């Protein structure tokens, strides 16, 4: 079965993102296809490369990045939500005159069209 996941919670402070990550791992382990994860609202904080958890805490931002690298799962970030929350790639940083970017490698700024496409091409969309 083909799945897409929508994450609306930040990497830390709520259970949404970590539950979504565990669900993603379980899907892959059970042989399902996870085509994409779409980060929306506060979920865009999962793509902030400046997140720095304590050494004894799980690094969820890097875990999402590894999921992308190992399994080819698309990690799409809502561009409007990201810009409102200060998560930008190099292109947007330059366009907005910002000193630097902070989008973690493996994540892609995209519009709601990416979510719509995932919804149309998947058997199930699960929101956290």
Swiss-Prot record:
GO terms for molecular function: sulfur carrier activity; sulfurtransferase activity. Its EC number is 2.8.1.-. Pfam families: DsrE (PF02635). The active site is at residue 78. Part of a sulfur-relay system required for 2-thiolation of 5-methylaminomethyl-2-thiouridine (mnm(5)s(2)U) at tRNA wobble positions. Accepts sulfur from TusA and transfers it in turn to TusE. GO terms for biological process: tRNA wobble position uridine thiolation. It comes from Escherichia coli (strain K12). This is Sulfurtransferase TusD. It comes from the Bacteria. It is an enzyme of class 2 (transferase). It is found in: Cytoplasm. SUPFAM superfamilies: DsrEFH-like. Heterohexamer, formed by a dimer of trimers. The hexameric TusBCD complex contains 2 copies each of TusB, TusC and TusD. The TusBCD complex interacts with TusE. Its main location: cytoplasm. One of its GO terms (cellular component) is cytosol. Keywords: Cytoplasm, Transferase, tRNA processing. The lineage of its organism: Bacteria, Pseudomonadati, Pseudomonadota, Gammaproteobacteria, Enterobacterales. Belongs to the DsrE/TusD family. The gene is tusD. InterPro entries: DsrEFH-like, Sulphur_relay_DsrE/F-like, Sulphur_relay_TusD/DsrE. Changing residue 122 to S: Reduced activity.
């Amino acid at each position: 079965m083909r799945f897409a996941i929508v994450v609306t919670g930040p990497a830390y402070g709520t259970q949404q993102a970590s539950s979504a990550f565990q669900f993603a791992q379980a899907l892959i382990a059970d042989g399902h296809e996870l085509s994409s994860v779409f980060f929306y609202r506060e979920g865009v904080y999962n793509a902030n490369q400046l997140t720095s958890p304590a050494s004894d805490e799980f690094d969820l931002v890097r875990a999402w990045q590894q999921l992308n690298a190992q399994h080819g799962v698309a990690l799409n970030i809502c561009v409007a939500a990201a810009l409102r929350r200060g998560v930008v790639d190099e292109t947007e940083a330059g366009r907005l005159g910002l000193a630097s970017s902070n989008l973690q490698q493996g994540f892609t700024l995209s519009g709601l069209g990416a979510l719509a496409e995932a919804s149309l091409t998947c058997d199930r969309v699960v929101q956290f």
